[in-house]
Amino acid sequence: MKNFGTMCISLATAAMLFTGCGALKGGAIGGAAAGALGAGIGALAGGGKGAAIGAGIGVAVGATAGALIGKKMEKQKAELEAIEGADVETVTDNNGLDALKVTFDSGILFATNKSDLTATSKASLDKFAISLLQNPETDVTIYGHTDSTGSLEVNQRISLQRAQSVQNYLQSKGIEAGRIVKVEGKAYTEPVASNDTAEGRAANRRVEVYISANETMVEQAE
């Protein structure tokens, strides 16, 4: 696992913004709607607390199928760990299956207060997209985060725009829009470090991408 200093690898739960907004398969959703949707799909278990990921398959997945999916995720994790600027962690989705959380430090992806991807970040996302294309039976969820500098409104907009920049770039590299099931900006509502220090604020500025088994992968594993 690569450690780039300012990179953060955990997702904490905070109150949902009443102005929160995001995108679900291309459509905009408000904070309340996103919260309701997340509750309906199911919340990520373990380190992710509150991030709704995983196909809503509605049935229990057997141990054998779960083990097969775990092996596939472990293989992809090894691929992703070679990407500059990406920190990869195994988490558990709402179906109890292994999933991956890939955290990109916003300092690597974007210039300060900008949502346009840098040339360096595009090189990393090119490799990330290749891994997604080679593992097509997965869904992708993207969250943007900021530190607490500035107003809630400004940070909400920037966090969403950054998440959407990653979404749009991945789609430009051949990732089908239907695979990206949720894109949301969370502003500074889910800090992973103190915003009282420069180091903490840097850790809080990040984009998180979750990779989880879709229904096809689950069906094939059973």
Residue ranges and their predicted role:
Residues L109-Y143, Q171, A202, V209-Y210, ...:
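Periplasmic peptidoglycan-binding/anchoring modules of Gram-negative envelope and division proteins
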